[in-house]
């Protein structure tokens, strides 16, 4: 059985991946792979408590900045 907190985090991570995909015209797999490669997913996991309180556009912007600092070009 999945705990509610875990389910909430998973749903938030999926939503962020999809919002990032939409912002950069990617499909879900491309978005996840990019975020994983350039440490955006690590950022979401590490900073979930703060990050889930901001809007999705702000979260996408934060992810873009993190990924750029780690070699991403979007």
Question: Where do the language-model regions lie?
Answer:
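N-terminal acidic leader/helix
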Residues: 1-28
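Arginine residue identity/basic-tract feature
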Residues: 4-9, 39, 68-69, 73
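Amphipathic, hydrophobic secondary-structure cores in small proteins
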Residues: 21-23, 27-52
